[in-house]
Amino acid sequence: MKKYLHISLILMLLSVSGYAQQRVTVRLDNRPMSELFEIIKNQTNYRIYCASEVSDLLIISVDEMNVEPLALIRRMLQNTNFQLSTFQNAIYIIENRTLITTLPESFYTKTRTEIYDVSVNNTVPVFERETKASSETQIYTIGDPNAVSSSYIVLTGVVSNINNGESMPGVTLLLEDPVIGTTTDAFGFYSIRLPSGRRDLVIRSIGMKDSKRQLMLFSDGKLDIELSEQLITLSDVVVVANRIDNVRSLGIGIERVKIQSIKNIPTVMGQTDILRIVMALPGVKSAGEISSGFNVRGGATDQNLILYNDGTIYMPTHMFGLFSAFNPDIVDNMELYKSSIPAKYGGRISSVLDVNSKEGNKKKFQGAGSLGLLMSQLTLEAPLFEGKGSFIFGGRTTYSDWLLGMIPNKSGYSNGSAGFYDLNASANYRFNEKNAVYLTGYYSHDRFNFTVMEQYEYENANFSAKWKHTFNPKLTNTFVVGHDHYSYFTKDMNDIYNAYSLDFAINQIFGKADFSYYLNTRHTLNAGINTIYYRLDPGNYLPVHPKSLIKEDRLLSEKSMESAVYLSDQWEISPLWIVNAGIRYSIFNILGPRVYNIYSSDYLLPSLTAILEADSVGNGILKTYRGPEFRLSARYIIDEKTSVKAGVNTMRQYIHKISNSTVMSPTDTWKLSNLYIRPQTGTQYVTGLFRNFANNTIETSVEIYYKTMNNYLDYRGGAELMMQSHIETEVAGVKGKAYGVELMVKKLQGKLNGWVSYTWSRSMMHRHEELTSSANTSNWYPADFDKPHEVKFVGNYKLTHRYSFSLNCDYSTGRPITIPVAKYWYRGKQYVYYSERNKYRVPDFFRVDVSFNIEAGHRLTKLTHGYFNIGIYNATGRKNAYSVYYVSEDRHVQGYKLSIFGAPIPYASYNIKF
């Protein structure tokens, strides 16, 4: 026995001797410290753990031979706030803290009624070669140990970012045995019912380090949690996400994106774009490049509810669709509901895009800015009232006239100009643990003209005030009131005898109250009420020159009220089965005063020839539409890595976009339902299989859906849509159906991460043959946005901490069009005969974008840190057809193809933080 003991002691001494005698030779000139760490790793058996701000941003120069690495690193860290500590063969570098490697002697003598805190003098304990914050190694006592014991308790609190104090929505909190979980709401608040006794709670969030809290639970209580950003070792790059959500979450057809995870994806002109990311997801399509709207699972562009801090955005883009309306430096997260739409949402039948802004840094002043070829932006944020509140302000503006100046004069668009600006402001204040208020405002203005004689302008504006109140650990609610505005103005003076101006506006005042009640571990109830008051000004058509022959025309304003109540229950039948069932009942009242036409009953549809007389009503309710909307989702876990989900939604929509264009346009007209234009309704059925691989770092999913739509407005042949007091004579309600399969693979971890998806889908429309004389009236015809095949790839490769490469590929079938197929003469006049509607297609779409991102190296003593982004949009230079149109020239019909970006477009932008 002594022999083996002596051998063990000798081996330990040799190991310690070898550990102490490791030497390195280093020659670096003005290089980041990360390169020093790589040299030490290669020449010794040390492992180094640090944050990226040390390894990348600290610039050093060193020329040493046969030097001891620990002494060398300590010299390099002099005059900084970073401390070096070691444990076995690991080196840890942490800001303002050192590490202890043993427990205090009194650790095991504490009683269970105390908080077991092993942190000493701002140090962090290290066990099993891991760096753990003191918050993870202490045991938190929740409740009163002397209270009457209960088998279950309710734990509530707020999860926030340790760096800036901002609350964090969408954070997963999970008890693994037994399996009980929840997620934080939009304010970072959570409520979870847990079995009493000693428990470990795991906390996960996108881009943040996984954390754990050791709890001793006696009775109901509160625990606020702070999460830190993911630490990255030199040898590995990890993209952290809610890895189990793909399998365990209830929702199907839901995409959640944190803005930090998409900033490297290449977009036109180098600006991070929320809508471009949305369009890179499966099941989301657009009519073409720089489209202002998007189509979700066969729905039209007006069937998507776009929310920004609870306010409605009617025009979500700037500058013809080049940029989205959302400032990426202000946005914190977004959720896209393609199905499994919660009962609290309503008003559109296809999807909900809910975008939320940051709250602002609650701990220190911070700013960010960027400079690009077309646009610049600036963001400022800071704490208020000693950290009880915060504010954030951001603005963007463009200087793009130089680009339009490059358009050749022969194009007919000489001397044009275009520009926009938008402003975001938000402030919040937390009075106490139960009450907090949030104020947000948004304004944007676009203007453009292709000649000096034309003018186009449009604007969005939103304001909301929100009060979050916690009645008790089980019951919380949110009250919101606000105002939304959208308007456009056009003026044309090319011909003074026909010079005119045209304007349109829609205003809405809204209010809502949402309640969440945590009944028990199996039931969570959500209920609420909301209402919207609409005032729509359809248009004023006015002469703008003394010689103009235009006759003044002012359409009467329209007023309506939309209200709804809802109730839903999330029921956990067992750890394997979970169901969410909800009902929403909506009511739409058409308000007076109103003038309307009375049509002859001899005609199937309203028409000019069928008008019998005009009638008017005063104030009051002219007509009411109402109906229930059902929501049902279910999930079954097959095993820990596989689940199957299904759901059904029924939706109602009372406002419609009137347009004869495939894409959204600033001059599109919106129309409220009236006596003859009925609300749109839609029903969607969906099911899917979800499975994770490679230790939950690769997510896969297959979703199948079928959707029906009724009363979708399609324009009639020869329709005149502008300034129509009887718009019902120019449009017709049609039926629609859409179905498809979406396949997606996500890689969440490693230097290479991103996703690839394939979608096969169809979107079809149908009119009864009595409604029109078109050739294919009795058949289903493809919708204008029908694209059967679509493949999308988004990838990021992290070369080093400072350098990364991004690639975006997009392929889709060309959208359908109607073309002239013959010409004929009748009574001395030539006519063109068109094909069946949407029988042909434009050429297939294909585009590749690449970008290279450089994180600039700076000394820690500097106040600013920047990064540089360069790339090429449409790297292959393919001339994708935006549209195909035909012009009669010398008695011949000539076809033309319009391409928006027919060549590679290089771009560069510089971003700075301070």
Describe the function of each predicted region.
Residues 16-112, 183, 254, 296:
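N-terminal export/assembly leaders
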Residues 19-25, 47-60, 147, 152-154, ...:
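N-terminal periplasmic "start-of-domain" segments of outer-membrane beta-barrel proteins
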Residues 117-146, 183, 207-209, 221, ...:
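Periplasmic N-terminal accessory/gating domains of Gram-negative outer-membrane beta-barrel systems
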Residues 372-397, 410-447, 455-483, 519-521:
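Transmembrane beta-barrel wall of Gram-negative outer-membrane proteins
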Residues 487-489, 535-547, 551, 589-613, ...:
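Surface-exposed extracellular loop regions of Gram-negative outer-membrane beta-barrel proteins
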Residues 508-512, 554, 562-564, 672-678, ...:
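Outer membrane beta-barrel strand-and-loop segments of large Gram-negative receptors
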Residues 706-708, 727-821:
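Gram-negative outer-membrane beta-barrel transporters
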Residues 802, 811-829, 845-849, 853-914:
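C-terminal beta-signal and adjacent terminal beta-strands/loops
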